[in-house]
Swiss-Prot record:
The keyword Coiled coil does not apply. Zn(2+) binds at C6, C9, C28, C31. NCBIfam families: clpX, PRK05342.1. The lineage of its organism: Bacteria, Pseudomonadati, Campylobacterota, Epsilonproteobacteria, Campylobacterales. It comes from Wolinella succinogenes (strain ATCC 29543 / DSM 1740 / CCUG 13145 / JCM 31913 / LMG 7466 / NCTC 11488 / FDC 602W) (Vibrio succinogenes). This is ATP-dependent Clp protease ATP-binding subunit ClpX 1.
């Protein structure tokens, strides 16, 4: 079985998408066409047009390949990554392999949108971004709390599709096969503490508005965003093939699950065992729990795939700092290298950073903010630190006035303090 794949987009070799081999690298037809457009521009393309790219994804990565892509950037969350990979695979298989179904077969495969439940900074947004990049499809990310019903100050729900259209560079067909990630969906529940007493600006009314686009319909979208008005131009977007992913922390959900199961909060404390038990409880979430939380049944009925993410542990935090392809430590080391300096962290310093992120309850998302705080003065002086190795110690994390170790690199490669 031929397992060669394009070194640029990872598409496997097929009859319709052959590969050109180089020195241990391969490039597919679609990447050659893309490179031609970049190098020679629109004028050359019009004078000597190339064959149009085939619509859609020529090769749909398998669930294992999708999970492998997630593994490169998302630490832990094994069950969530597996569920997510299968759901994304089935979604795009449903779109691009319709021709494999018998014409007489009237079975219609419904769209499976996804709900990700997990603490802040557990990787919900990162998972969506990673697979969108891997599949080369546009993605729009929005915060549900910024959405309001038509007629109130805030964003119309249709503006989500405007963002997707802009991410697709105005290509409607490409946008119609993209991904929309709606974060903090739990904050627009009917039981939200932020809900107005006199009117429902960003609660059930927004859920009803979201329902229309999530379930699949043709929506008039203002290409430049903003509020709709009669004299405005609109673009029609069919949302039936757009994958909608909703995410939220759903604080207090565990108590609802305990109540449904006839239990109580006794025995659950802030220790490690208690945290793991609470994560296990969250995995037992059911649609009825979401209704009790304040999401309308119609919306839950359109989110067929529900999975949960665990709270990030200290061990996972340490891996997040150093292991992924775009690990934060690697990013900051690259910034230092650009100024001909070197950056390293003592193991104790990384542990202190992880512990501080856990203390702040910001998850993996808070790691960058902590490193920014620790390296601020160094970044300010970085142009003067050429040919130095900078070592961040535990003291630098715990005490902002502490100075890092500076080691001068000699020309022969040796270092001196």
């Amino acid at each position: 079985m031929n397992s060669r794949q394009c070194s640029f987009c990872r598409a496997k070799e097929t009859k319709t998408n052959p590969l050109i081999a180089g020195n241990s690298v391969y490039i597919c037809k679609n990447c050659v066409i893309s490179a031609y457009k970049i190098l020679f521009g629109e004028m050359e393309r019009e004078s000597d047009p190339l064959p149009e790219e085939e619509e859609g994804i020529d090769y749909i990565p398998t669930p294992k390949e999708l999970k492998s892509a997630l593994d490169e950037y998302v630490i832990g969350q094994e069950r969530a990554k597996k569920v997510f990979s299968v759901a994304v695979y089935n979604h795009y298989k449903r779109i691009f392999k319709k021709e494999l179904l018998e014409e007489e077969d009237e079975t219609e495969i419904s769209k499976s949108n996804i709900l990700l439940i997990g603490p802040t900074g557990s990787g919900k947004t990162l998972m969506a971004q990673t697979l969108a990049r891997f599949l080369n499809v546009p993605i729009a990310i929005c915060d549900a709390t910024s959405l309001t019903e038509a007629g109130y100050v805030g964003e119309d729900v249709e503006n989500i599709l405007t963002r997707l259209l802009q991410a697709a560079e105005g290509d409607v067909k490409k946008a119609e096969r993209g991904i929309v990630f709606i974060d903090e969906i739990d904050k627009i529940s009917r039981l939200s503490e932020n809900r107005s007493i006199t009117r429902d600006v960003s609660g059930e009314g927004v859920q009803q508005a979201l329902l229309k686009i999530i379930e699949g319909s043709v929506v008039n979208v203002p290409p430049k965003g903003g509020r709709k008005h009669p004299n405005q131009d609109f673009v029609q977007i069919d949302t039936s093939q757009i994958l909608f992913i909703c995410g939220g922390a759903f604080d207090g959900m565990i108590e609802l699950i305990k109540r449904r199961m006839g239990g109580n909060s006794l025995g659950f404390h802030g220790d490690k065992k208690g945290k793991s038990e609470e994560s296990a409880l969250l995995h037992l979430v059911e649609p009825d729990d979401l209704v009790s939380y304040g999401l309308i049944p119609e919306l839950i009925g359109r989110l067929h795939v529900i999975t949960t993410l665990d709270e990030i542990t200290k061990e996972a935090m340490l891996e997040i700092l150093t292991k992924p392809k775009n690990a934060l430590v690697k990013q900051y080391q690259k910034l230092f290298t650009m100024d001909e300096a070197e950056l390293s962290f003592e193991p104790e310093a990384l542990e202190a950073i992880a512990e501080l992120a856990i203390k702040r309850k910001t998850g993996a998302r808070g790691l960058r903010a902590i490193i920014e705080e620790v390296t601020l003065d160094l970044m300010y002086d970085l142009p003067e630190l050429k040919e130095y190795e900078v070592i961040i110690t535990k003291e630098c994390v715990e005490n902002r006035d502490a100075k890092p170790l500076l080691i001068k690199k000699k020309k022969n490669g040796k270092k001196s303090a």
